[in-house]
């Protein structure tokens, strides 16, 4: 299957994952993965912003954290999930509606690894996040096209974009990532627009 077909098939997974996140469905029933594996995806209610929580094979993962104005609501939702720490936190791009609440996540939880695209022009919100990452004693791991993040037991993130080191629009830094879990996959895109889509399909 070529890359374009893989991306298109992954888009179908978005519908499944949206329903799973809404209804809190455990997505382990029909996937070809070990019986002790698990996957749960929840889209958090952060108002006019984005945040997704993933539990896979014992790993707690957060993709974006919504705006700072809704960080209290985000933390309440995360607390209800009995999270001790995050194995992985991903910031897709520097817009406030995606990463504004992330500083408070770092204050509340231990974070073991932080990924973000390499940003050449930034925002004050992103600078505050970078400081929080350093205060945690972490180094930012660059998120870029071609990399794979192993999540164990047949689960992994494949990153298709960004493929360049500099873009005019901040949205174009948004990674297009496929989460594979057994024979099922789900696509995460941040605020990726036409340019990122073209890069992913190239």
Predicted regions and their residues:
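Non-globular, low-confidence helical/coil segments that flank catalytic cores
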Residues: 2-202
């Amino acid at each position: 299957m070529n890359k374009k077909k893989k991306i298109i098939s992954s888009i179908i997974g978005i519908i499944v994952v949206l329903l799973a996140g809404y209804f809190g469905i455990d997505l382990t029933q029909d996937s070809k993965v070990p019986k002790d594996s698990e996957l749960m995806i929840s889209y958090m209610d952060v108002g006019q912003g984005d945040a997704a929580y993933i539990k896979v094979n014992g790993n707690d993962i957060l993709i974006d954290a919504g705006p700072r104005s809704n960080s209290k609501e985000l933390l309440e939702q995360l607390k209800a999930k009995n999270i001790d720490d995050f194995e992985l936190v991903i910031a897709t791009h520097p817009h406030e509606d995606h990463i504004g609440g992330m500083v408070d996540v770092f204050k509340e939880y231990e974070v073991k690894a932080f990924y973000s695209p390499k940003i050449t022009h930034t925002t004050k919100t992103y600078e505050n996040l970078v400081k929080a990452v350093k205060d945690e004693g972490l180094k930012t791991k660059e998120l870029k096209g071609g990399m794979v993040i192993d999540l164990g037991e047949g689960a992994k993130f494949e990153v298709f974009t960004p493929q360049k080191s500099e873009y005019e629009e901040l949205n174009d830094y948004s990674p297009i990532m496929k989460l594979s879990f057994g024979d099922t996959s789900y696509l995460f895109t941040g605020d990726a627009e036409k340019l990122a889509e073209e890069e992913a399909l190239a």
